Amino acid sequence: LWLFHSPANFIKTFCHSAVNGALLFIQLCQPLFEVIMNKNKLKALALPVLKNAVSLRLRIEKALARRRKMAEYNPALEHDLNIVIHNKQLNTIPKKVWMFWAGTLVPVEIQSFVNKVARENPAWTVNVVNDSNLSQYLPELTFTRQDLLVAHRSDVIRLELLYKYGGVWMDASIILNQPLDAFLAVNEDNRYDMIAFYREVSTVDQRYPVIETWFMAVPEKNHFIENWLRYFKPIIEEGAAAMFNRLQQLPNYKEIAQKITNPQYLILNITQQQALREYNQYNFYLRKCEANAIYYQRLVSWDAVQLSRMIMVDKLPEVLPPIIKLTGLDRKYLSTNLKYGVINKDSLLGEVLFADVPQKQPDTSIAEMPGRAPVTLK
């Protein structure tokens, strides 16, 4: 009788129930796909299925108008470490940004992040270093080991570039929401050896803070970088496994490692601790990354699906953190979210992507990146 008297309402209710049923099915299947992915033989098959399932789920939620608003950045959560040991006036931090991207293809979101930095910091030169142009900047640096991870090669490169030229090292996966001059304004009297971030949960002893390596601002020929490089550069010859085994044999290894997660991968952080313990007479201004650059990851306990929804679907807050650091995990569902039209133009990632790169543009080579002066992309 209801169908006969109100066919429009019946169809609307039926469609709504069908969509909710599909959404529930995808949510129930998602843990199964993740379990399957833990089996290496099935990972290649399961990963595309999982990505499509998650993106379809987000697309359905978007269709049902289930949008939220991202949490506001809360400066009250900040706990800066202003460490001043000496009264020396150091060299000015040069207006140079350094990034590294291995290979020749750059994902569309990385193109947009780089362009955003250049566009909003016109007085700075943004240099994207890659395997092809590395010799232009560091002609004496060579890598002979085939088993050295890209991450560890990048670690050597960032220290070498910062020591030789100074400036700001930024991972290419950073979304910069504040002009660099404003972010570095604390250094107006050139007193700091480094301006960077520290990870509070990894730091046991605040005399030796665990400094994050994805954003570091230093003057050229900085003694701290030189000392750090001396401890880390042997990885080129030793390899990561042998070097980590050697570090583990140190009598003070537990003190050095503090609570660094995955130390066999984060050897750069371990050697940073070595350098600090040898000579700790540096001035640092360190921001708490949990309250700033990885604020949103912490809010969702590093859940990739929740974070995808937050940065690609949800509305922007009134105030964003000055810097947002994204990882491969955070961008895990980006390609399928683009495919299904999940990303909203007024979301965090949408605002950056749609600023200068069409949504469906494929990954392009470094030489084809749509950089704007003064970006250096050779």
Where are these regions (language model features)?
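Glycosyltransferase-associated regions of secretory-pathway enzymes
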Residues: M37-S154, A172-K378
